[in-house]
């Protein structure tokens, strides 16, 4: 099932440092799209409320860092931690394996 949410409410003005050194704007929607694919692959359904909770938790964890740049591998760690804490272990495992680019 697709996670349908998020209008980057309370957006974060931050750059993501990609593995090749490029900088890219942080976009929660891009993360949500990746999680949609992971939930489909894990055959685990996530509803809109789940999506909002996941997004909120990820954004909260990022804000706590109080940085204007974050490495993509650190961002990945935060996403996986949030998924596991919210009980989406299977999706966290698929996401972890699938984002090795």
Label the model's feature ranges:
Residues 2-101:
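Long, C-terminal-biased catalytic regions of enzyme "large/alpha" subunits
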């Amino acid at each position: 099932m697709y996670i349908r949410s998020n209008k980057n409410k309370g957006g974060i003005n931050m750059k993501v440092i990609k593995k090749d050194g490029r900088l890219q704007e942080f976009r929660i929607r891009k993360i949500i799209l990746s999680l949609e694919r992971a939930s489909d692959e894990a055959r685990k359904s996530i509803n809109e409320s789940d999506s909002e909770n996941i997004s909120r938790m990820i954004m909260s964890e990022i804000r706590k860092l109080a940085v204007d740049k974050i490495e993509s591998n650190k961002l990945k760690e935060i996403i996986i931690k949030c998924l596991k804490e919210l009980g989406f272990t299977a999706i966290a495992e698929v996401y972890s394996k699938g984002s090795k680019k």
